Amino acid sequence: MLEKAKIDRINELSKKKKAGTLTATEKVEQDKLRKEYIKSFRTHMKGTIENTTIIDPNGTDVTPHKVKQLRKNKH
């Protein structure tokens, strides 16, 4: 995941934006940090989904076909 310092900076810039004191340079920095955060989040979420197996109450594997294909293509 993203470093704590970067997440703290995202939050700091967000507060400045709400207060109306965000400069143009800080806006560029905020956009860059947000994109980096979203990329990191998506990467981790994809890994979580790929490693999840869904079992119904009868004990049958009902993991969606698309997830099974992602696993197969990964290896």
Swiss-Prot record:
**Annotated stretches, region: Disordered:** 56-75
One Gene Ontology cellular component annotation held by this UniProt entry = cytoplasm
Q: Where in the cell is it found?
A: Cytoplasm
Q: Where is the composition biased (Basic residues)?
A: 65-75
Q: Coiled-coil annotation: which residues? A: none
Enumerate the UniProt keywords alphabetically: Cytoplasm
Domain of life, per UniProt, equals Bacteria
Q: Which cysteines are joined by disulfide bonds?
A: none
Q: Which family does it belong to?
A: Belongs to the UPF0291 family.
State the protein's name. UPF0291 protein LMOf2365_1322
Q: Which organism is it from?
A: Listeria monocytogenes serotype 4b (strain F2365)
Cite the source lineage: Bacteria, Bacillati, Bacillota, Bacilli, Bacillales
